[in-house]
Amino acid sequence: MLFSSVFFLFAFLPIVLFFYFIVCKRSMLAKNILLLFASLFFYAWGEPKFVLVMIVSIVANYIFGIAINKQLTAYENKGRLAKIILVLSVIFNLSILFIFKYLNFTLFNLNLIFKNIFPQTEILLPIGISFFTFQAMSYVIDVYRKTVDVQKNPLYLALYISFFPQLIAGPIVRYSTIEEQISSRTVTGADFSEGIRRFLIGLSKKVILANNFALVADQAFNIVGNNNISIAFAWLGSIAYTMQIFFDFSAYSDMAIGLGRMFGFKFLENFNYPYVSSSVSEFWRRWHISLGQWFRDYVYIPLGGSRVPNKVLVIRNLLIVWLLTGIWHGANWTFILWGLLYFALLAFEKIMGIPNKFESKQSKVLYAIFTFLMVNFGWVLFRSNNLLQAGIYLKAMFGLGDVIGIDNMFYQYFGEYWMFFFVGAVYSTGIFSYLRKRLSKIDILDRIIEFLGIAVYTVLFLISVSYLVMGAYNPFIYFNF
């Protein structure tokens, strides 16, 4: 089920809110059970058979958590068995991911090498499996580390793993973030209104901006294989996808955070205007923050992080993290190469001491431009169906081969969508958020902004709904991961 669908907006969400605040208002247990069943229904709406995969994951990780906690508390000085259980839990979770996400890819490539000696499988990918599996893994690991208390109520743990706002495409919520909120939370009028505001921002970003950028990007990537793309349209298409993936993914996070707020949950931010970054390392502190923190805390730091005896080990740790990051995003060589690209860029920055090495404003600005270009090239890899398409597209961007500089398709699409590019570029700088915070410090302006905000969000909602009713392009990119 999509957040940006008529059924979700006008049926599912209103019904869940009604039962949550009216029927179940006196019991936290009843509220949590309602949200759990709503979440299972939400997931089963599009993939009824795969809800069993998630239930198996929930049950298994509940048992792993209980077993580890029992060993740690009953045998304080004998945590060896607890460690074995932890390893088994990691193997179990990674096995689920491998079977559903990587087995097809692995067998296909092995058959290329060994002349089709393995049967080819066509296992379908459960939506959001990477997200709820990483949440489940982090919970069990944190129980072992004693950074969270074990959740003894299986329904509450099930709610944590399956909660519908962040189930499909994040953010990856740590159990420590909502540990207390699961059993005790309140929703004030300010919380609910802020949740609505944040949800409407996300809905507008998705339907009005991301979906329109997608029309440009899809056209560019669809025609590139026929060598019919000009240099100008190749660049326009790549920038369109750069904008699309930001507004698409951050929109989902906005809606997830807003929905969570409506029900009393406060999730951490997942994006912080990444395209204004002055370096690649800063970009990854601003982009998909929850994933970066997950790999930092559960892979990079356990390997030794940057506190290892020499830079060779630092580079090794970066290589492992970014290879895994690429693989996490999908079973395709394009994602693996995308991860390795960021490994190379981050290793370069680590070795050279960038951006701290720059002293002049000009050098910092130039490196910020370089960073954006590298991110843009990375998204070409990310969007391409295979390495061949990525190579052809990048060649077209640099005018290599039989391509022309500019064509009618560029004029057509730029003429039709230039306003979306302008609004997207301005919004991605964070200037709107900055001005809102500064002006809100003045009482009279704060009241004016609040009044105008209601009108603006109402208009944006109506425009978004009109797009949805017309059946506009709508799926979220990160549903595939």
Description of each model-found segment:
Residues 1-480:
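Membrane-embedded transmembrane alpha-helical bundles that form the catalytic cores
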